[in-house]
Amino acid sequence: MPRGQASKRRAREKRRQARGEDQCLGGAQATAAEKEKLPSSSSPACQSPPQSFPNAGIPQESQRASYPSSPASAVSLTSSDEGAKGQKGESPNSFHGPSSSESTGRDLLNTKTGELVQFLLNKYIRKEPITREAMLKVINRKYKQHFPEILRRSTENVEVVFGLYLKEMDPSRQSYVLVGKLDFPNQGSLSDGGGFPLSGLLMVLLSTIFMHGNRATEEEMWECLNALGMYKGRKHFIYGEPQELVTKDLVREGYLEYQQVPSSDPPRYEFLWGPRARAETSKMKVLEFVAKLNDTVASTYKSRYEEALREEEEQARARAVARDSARARASRSFQP
């Protein structure tokens, strides 16, 4: 490409990125927003759904995709669930009327978190090491004092949603690498085919189903997927076509059930836990996952917590009956 054309292309890209950051900052001027003080680690994550990458290939560094600053935005809690309130009657991730500067600072923190998440995933796809120096360069050195909080949010995102965690490889060089974190005991085939474990995404989907009363409508599931940057008919650069994934692949694996709502006319569809999900995880584990996303404890969600406890008690009784039955059979087999 001639030098002049390349220069113009870079200029257009910079203008496009500036417009995107302006939108993320709620219409404020990017130059003014950059001067705002970033919020403390106690600030809640924004809940606005992100945009997916422009194409299905490996995203380029210049493609500023927006990731949710916390996967909590993907788990849509039912408003009728009285347990979704904190001890003071508030949602665990609610907050009281932030000032304009606080809101702008929080949006900027979310933007920087999204940029770092994109960078980490690029490195994982390319199987390249990650250095602290490179991460600082991505977020801009002027935010060095906020790097620990941005890194914490970013690593939480990739751990929960993508099933990856950041492992230190060389302390002297401050070099790291993303590695898979397997949460399901029998998930050898639970992968997107490109090396990304699906356990994190699956936990988000199972959480959505459980928090909606053990069955989630197709609309509720797509609201969840949209919050993760996954849209119907649009190929995701990691997971491929989302509809194929949730209605066929995960159903075939036994993790989800996809069925028509009884007596619905016109037909409507819903998602339930599949037999493999029921065998490999539990309502309590999923509820603890939801609580972790919202920086609270499982008992905060009273009705769901009681339901999860009942399931644990029933499973404990079933195991006790099975053990007693096995002992009785063994005893009879040794009788003359």
From Swiss-Prot:
What positions does the domain MAGE occupy? Answer: 109-336
The GO annotation for biological process reads: negative regulation of transcription by RNA polymerase II
Gene Ontology, cellular component aspect: nucleus
Q: Where is the composition biased (Low complexity)?
A: 39-54, 62-80
User: Signal sequence: where?
Assistant: none
Q: Where is the composition biased (Polar residues)?
A: 90-103
Q: Which InterPro entries match?
A: MAGE, MAGE_N, MAGE_WH1, MAGE_WH2, MHD_dom
Where is composition skewed (Basic residues) in this entry? Answer: 1-17
- Region: Disordered; residue ranges are 1-108
Q: Which Gene3D superfamilies match?
A: MAGE homology domain, winged helix WH1 motif, MAGE homology domain, winged helix WH2 motif
Name used for this protein in its record: Melanoma-associated antigen B17
Q: Which organism is it from?
A: Homo sapiens
